[in-house]
């Protein structure tokens, strides 16, 4: 998948995030990125915190292992997850 690439020690996920949705869920690939809807609003970092929590739970890693690399204030984000391969991330996030 073009939205998940292996890097030293983990994977980088290219995401398109839609905050303030009715529920938090993965919608699928959209324009080369994985689209994720978040129930949290984009206020005071709530959506970013919800994204980190969602990814940590889905990938079965600690929240500290999920780091926002790019896109703190935008919808297009890059997230690094340590100790996870791209193949494992794809399997866990795309059902």
From Swiss-Prot:
Pfam families referenced in this protein's UniProt entry, alphabetically: DUF167
Cellular component aspect of the GO annotation: cytoplasm
SMART domains (alphabetical): DUF167
Family: Belongs to the UPF0235 family.
Entries under HAMAP family matching the protein: UPF0235
Cross-referenced PANTHER family: UPF0235 PROTEIN C15ORF40 (PTHR13420:SF7)
Protein name: UPF0235 protein Anae109_1126
């Amino acid at each position: 998948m073009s939205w998940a690439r292996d890097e030293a020690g983990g994977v980088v996920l290219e995401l398109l995030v839609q905050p303030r949705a009715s529920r938090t869920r993965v919608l699928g690939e959209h324009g080369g990125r994985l689209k994720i809807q978040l129930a949290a609003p984009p206020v005071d970092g709530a959506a970013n915190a919800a994204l980190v929590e969602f990814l940590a739970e889905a990938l079965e890693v600690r929240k500290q292992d999920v780091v926002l690399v790019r896109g703190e204030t935008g919808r297009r984000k890059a997230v690094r997850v340590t100790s996870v391969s791209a193949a494992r991330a794809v399997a866990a996030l795309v059902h």
